[in-house]
Amino acid sequence: MAYRDRTGLYITFRQSYSHHGQRLELSGWDPKEERQSLVHKDNKDNTVIEMDMLAPRWVTVEGEIDSLLLNTRRNINLLDKQYAKHVLPSFSDKTEQENEIQRLTIQITQDFQRCQKLLQVTKAQTNSATGSEALMAKNFLSNLASRIQTESAQFRKKQSTYLKKLRGLNANISPVESKLDETVSDVAISQSTIQQVALMEEQGEDEQAIRHERAVAKIAEGIIELAQMFQDLQVLVIEQGALVDRIDFNIEQTQVHAKSAEKELIKAESHQKNTGRLRFICFLILLIVALIVILAIKLLR
């Protein structure tokens, strides 16, 4: 390993520092006086500098949730590729693909659950907030809940489509089925899949088929967990919707007041113009009267 000897340079710096230290001592510089001039012991002499209010500690949770959601998006992209490979007809063993699908599914579900847990902890921390901070916390949590809900709903839809393909169901939803609650439909299919695995185990069917159905059941369990989390987050999203409705109402009222103020301003402007004309007319009348008086005085003389 190559290196350079810097001992000489270090000695030069040390000697230079000693030289400057002696010069400062000769000039009468006292470090204690310098410290006293910078830091006052008397609180009366201290100048209070007003600092900006720091952001609440719970705001930092947004970065953690963003990181988790970014990780879920990456894993979902990988999972989509595995789904596409697995549904292709093939006579080869797909155990490795099924294990990878199961691993990614569990990891994505756990990331969404971590997001929900962070949201619950943050909500507990903001319960003591009052005034404007409470309003800000409510809007902040509602926004995060909406983002988590959107991401989890998209993932649940992908899982449901894949599960229907595995179960031999039609993944394309008909117009009649689209009117039904998708969450209830997905949960019903998932529960049916789990019950079918239990029935196959009781009947002692082929181990290979049972193992395949267990992998499918894991996906079904993930759908049920995400559906439950979706319902929990819906409460915060509804609160955000109510808040948005109130904001829209306030905006509409502001527009009404602005139009009313514009009308009043137009009236005031017209009154001001009329006042100027009236003053000019009065001035002309006074001028005419003055001229008549002057003319009358001249005639009398």
Swiss-Prot record:
One Pfam short name: SNARE
Species of the source: Schizosaccharomyces pombe (strain 972 / ATCC 24843) (Fission yeast)
Function in brief: t-SNARE that functions in transport from the endosome to the late Golgi and on the endocytic pathway.
Membrane topology, Vesicular segments: 301
GO molecular-function terms, A-Z: SNAP receptor activity; SNARE binding
Family: Belongs to the syntaxin family.
Protein's name according to its UniProt entry: t-SNARE affecting a late Golgi compartment protein 2
Entry's localization field: Golgi apparatus, trans-Golgi network membrane; Endosome membrane
t-SNARE coiled-coil homology domain sequence ranges: 206-268
Any one biological process term the GO annotation gives: vesicle fusion
